[in-house]
Amino acid sequence: MNILYVHGFGSNYDTTSPKIKMLEELGTVVGKDVDYSSGFKKVYAEIKDFALGNDIDLIVGTSLGGHTASHVGTNLGIPFVAINPAITPSVSLKDYLGTHNDFVGSTYTLREDIVDAWPSFLTGGCGCIIVEMGDEICDANETITELTPHYEVNALPTEVTYLTT
């Protein structure tokens, strides 16, 4: 099985992460670094083209990567798993406007027009949602409420380190 892993905002594709190692037990895992400050249209196009070019069977994404997985997976007909997904990035990304350093030390600038253009989580695809109840960024209860009518949503206890690292 070919698995595409899509990292979250301010992170990077790290082949040594526990999530990647866990996914490697299921198949071949590929991914790429994504600059979310470039906007939804560019990110979507990059991930879609990457998925098409790598014969992907499953997309797994975390946080904003889970959001992106919902759009790419739904539009390409590829099953996806969204872990602690951002469901309304046009709201949640407002906290990161301006110029900052991300989790890996790179500088990014996030503009309000870029944030406002992010659509909500896409429903209608073949997906599964996993939420950690203690996630500090994505509200698990909101995710459960919003996505349960559309997807199987699995809630895990607080601090599941292999999902949040």
Which residues make up each language-model segment?
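Short hydrophobic segments within beta-strands
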Residues: 5-9, 60, 130-132
